């Protein structure tokens, strides 16, 4: 298809985007326009970066919750159960 090339962000751009994300998970359009102009990116690049960053943030926070013991054992129990069932079948 006619997919865009992957954007390679500079360290400066990433630093600014991360800094902005730290204060605001969501951008209003005027702020997006401002950041895009500031970092010499398109609005779309800024928008997509924020979308992707929110998903990454969501994944990371879900991982942390699992490490706290919530939902961690469930996966293991399910795994063990299926192995036990396989052994019984033999």
From Swiss-Prot:
SUPFAM superfamilies: Homeodomain-like. This is Homeobox protein Hox-A2. Keywords: Developmental protein, DNA-binding, Homeobox, Nucleus, Transcription, Transcription regulation. The keyword Disulfide bond does not apply. Residues 2-61 bind DNA. CDD domains: homeodomain (cd00086). Sequence-specific transcription factor which is part of a developmental regulatory system that provides cells with specific positional identities on the anterior-posterior axis. It holds the Pfam family Homeodomain. The keyword Amino-acid biosynthesis does not apply. Belongs to the Antp homeobox family. It comes from Notophthalmus viridescens (Eastern newt). Its main location: nucleus. It comes from the Eukaryota. Residues 80-90 have a biased composition (Acidic residues). GO terms for molecular function: DNA-binding transcription factor activity, RNA polymerase II-specific; RNA polymerase II cis-regulatory region sequence-specific DNA binding. Residues 55-90 are annotated as: Disordered. It is found in: Nucleus. One of its GO terms (cellular component) is nucleus.
